[in-house]
């Protein structure tokens, strides 16, 4: 744990305490400023109510048999565009029936995910993000890289911030002295394609929430990049199971790949929006040093537990290999 520094702190305050030119890589996932009230939030409340002790089933056996969503599923079960044979339908029949009786939907609570994430997203602004990019530029060493995941529809604004987030300077242009601003160079897009995307209102929106975008940017000089003919497209699943507890949690294998390609063992990696501590875990698993923070007390506590469990796993693997 000596290579992990994780604080319960606001991100800008955390960065302001770091020395200039001291960080090798920033890998982070700031709020996308996309919170909204929607039917998905109502469904989360509905599921929570049905999960309470003593809650009655919403539907009857007869309603399940005649449920319109089943259609011809007694013959085949359509998964995406692919008909699954009757045998597969029977395999899942008990699960779908249980879900429908309890929640009123064969999918149960599978897609009960909030779209209003809370104050940490709705109170974040583009002006605040601009302040973060300036700190990113200051704390990174020359040749250091920033990788920032952000909302697809605001990514151009982020690119413009990165291009002008450095210090100002004056230079002669013709007969006049003009003021210029330094910024990140070699700004590129990378794309994460989720191999198990979560449908967003799948009855109305046939396009699932299947991809996210990040920008990579280098501060001066030549950045660390240990790959050849890389197309910048990464196909990894969403985090699942007990270690998923943050609504915008990123894929651990994805972050491990990004850390391995854009840094060296022993390098210092920073994430001021640590969330579920995915960046920290990726650093632990690849031999890097991590420094980061999370301002939400709830997620900080859960992330601390995740870091501790991962350290215990690593210790166990190390002792068993001796």
Predicted stretch roles:
Residues 210-214:
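Short hydrophobic/aromatic beta-strand or adjacent loop that forms the aromatic wall/cage
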Residues 1-198, 205, 209, 220-322:
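S-adenosyl-L-methionine-dependent nucleic acid methyltransferase catalytic domains
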């Amino acid at each position: 744990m000596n290579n992990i520094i994780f604080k319960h702190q606001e991100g800008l305050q955390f960065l302001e305490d770091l020395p200039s030119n001291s960080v090798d890589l920033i890998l982070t996932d700031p709020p996308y400023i996309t919170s909204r009230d929607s039917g998905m939030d109502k469904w989360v409340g509905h599921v929570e109510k049905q999960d309470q002790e003593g809650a009655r089933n919403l539907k009857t056996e007869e309603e399940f048999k005649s449920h319109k969503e089943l259609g011809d599923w007694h013959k085949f079960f359509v998964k995406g565009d692919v008909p699954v044979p009757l045998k597969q339908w029977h395999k899942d029949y008990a699960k779908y029936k249980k879900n429908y009786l309890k929640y009123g939907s064969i999918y149960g609570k599978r897609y009960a995910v909030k779209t209003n994430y809370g104050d940490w997203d709705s109170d974040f602004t583009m002006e605040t993000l601009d302040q973060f990019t300036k700190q990113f530029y200051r704390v990174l060493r020359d040749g250091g890289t920033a990788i920032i995941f952000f909302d697809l529809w605001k990514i151009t604004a982020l690119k413009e911030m990165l291009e002008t987030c450095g210090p100002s300077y004056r230079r002669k242009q013709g007969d006049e002295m003009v003021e210029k601003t330094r910024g990140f160079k070699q700004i590129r897009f990378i794309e994460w394609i989720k191999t198990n995307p979560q449908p967003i209102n799948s009855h109305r929106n046939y396009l699932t929430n299947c991809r996210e975008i990040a920008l990579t940017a280098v501060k001066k000089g030549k950045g660390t990049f240990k790959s050849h003919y890389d197309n910048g497209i990464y196909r990894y699943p969403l985090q699942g199971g007990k270690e998923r507890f943050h609504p915008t949690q990123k894929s651990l294998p994805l972050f491990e790949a990004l850390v391995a390609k854009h840094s060296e063992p022993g390098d210092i990696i920073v994430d001021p929006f640590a969330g579920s501590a995915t960046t920290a875990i990726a650093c632990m698993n690849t031999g890097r040093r991590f420094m980061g923070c999370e301002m939400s007390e709830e997620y900080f506590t859960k992330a601390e537990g995740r870091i501790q469990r991962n350290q215990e796993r690593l210790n166990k693997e190390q002792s068993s290999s001796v």
